[in-house]
């Protein structure tokens, strides 16, 4: 948060995007896991705004909902998601509502040149990420194989996944 000078961080679990298969956890379960993960951080707010919305989940709609004249929104994305920005729904309007911060994994350079050419009004900043190399796919794969995930998610989230047998987590 300090790197981007943020006063607050809003974590917004998304509905199933139109381009992805249905999730293995319900909206309520995903919301609960995010709330558990964010509980220790008072400046992190969890919003169910996308989960309450009917129809497809588009980032531009969420940005419009959160935009006010007195705040600067920052959309934080991983490099994999940021690379697809030009094909997002109403991508050319993203810069009207936010700037984009791309979390760049150490050793994985992210070239934003093409994005800047296609979306010239979008301000993009890159933030080096030295944290744990995590992917939702790796978490689901480990769960399905009965392997521990405590090194990838907070302990309370790992417990929740195990208790609710999500992502193929074995039953006791």
What residue spans do the PLM features occupy?
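Nucleotidyltransferase catalytic core that binds NTPs
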Residues: 1-172
């Amino acid at each position: 948060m300090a790197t981007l000078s943020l006063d607050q961080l809003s974590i917004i679990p998304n509905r199933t995007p139109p381009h992805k298969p249905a999730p293995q956890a319900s909206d309520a379960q995903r919301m609960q896991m995010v709330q558990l993960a964010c509980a220790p951080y008072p400046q992190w707010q969890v919003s169910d705004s996308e989960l309450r919305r009917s129809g497809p989940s588009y980032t531009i709609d969420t940005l419009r909902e959160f935009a006010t004249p007195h705040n600067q929104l920052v959309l934080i994305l991983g490099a994999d998601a940021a690379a697809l920005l030009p094909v997002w729904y109403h991508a050319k309007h993203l810069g009207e509502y936010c700037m984009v911060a791309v979390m760049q994994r150490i050793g994985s350079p992210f070239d934003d040149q093409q994005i800047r050419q296609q979306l010239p009004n979008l301000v993009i900043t890159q933030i080096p990420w030295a944290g744990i190399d995590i992917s939702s796919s790796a978490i689901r794969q480990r769960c399905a194989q009965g392997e521990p995930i405590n090194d990838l998610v907070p302990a309370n989230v790992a417990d929740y996944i195990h208790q609710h047998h999500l992502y193929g987590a074995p039953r006791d």
